[in-house]
């Protein structure tokens, strides 16, 4: 499978399960950061479509008051992840680099996929040139997310009762890892690259707009 086919599958998972999509988008963000001819244009595209997606995002996930105003969609999260990679590459002072990365990770608290997406991005950046490290990165991501789900569920379900939820949260990450590690051929689609490039940006605000309008129509 080429990169664009896997991204199309990730778009489909966005409609049913965001977790697999989080991993896939973070993985290809790291890959795209290394391939892009202009990091400034890459960041600009993320920012532009993040702004376009914000109103549809608030239609789908309405929150009142300050909480609603300070909640941003996942493209803003990916922009923060991009800035994490930029800080890692461009800032030479070890202390300043760590400070900026930690600040960006905590800034994601105000976005969808808070905290986890930047951490996943750092994992994949660490694993970028090593197949063994990629296996480790997906394993750590599954344990990390599954562990968080277990801690959340055990309060009401107990330690054993929370295990099905834990496995349910970890499995999409492992499935995502399987597709990328064993089926991905490291290439982009041979044809219609321009279409795929812009479709992946436009899909997110587009599908949110449709869901938001449906919500307004059905619930008022």
Please annotate each region the language model reported:
Residues 1-220:
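Alpha-helical transmembrane segments and their immediate juxtamembrane cytosolic regions
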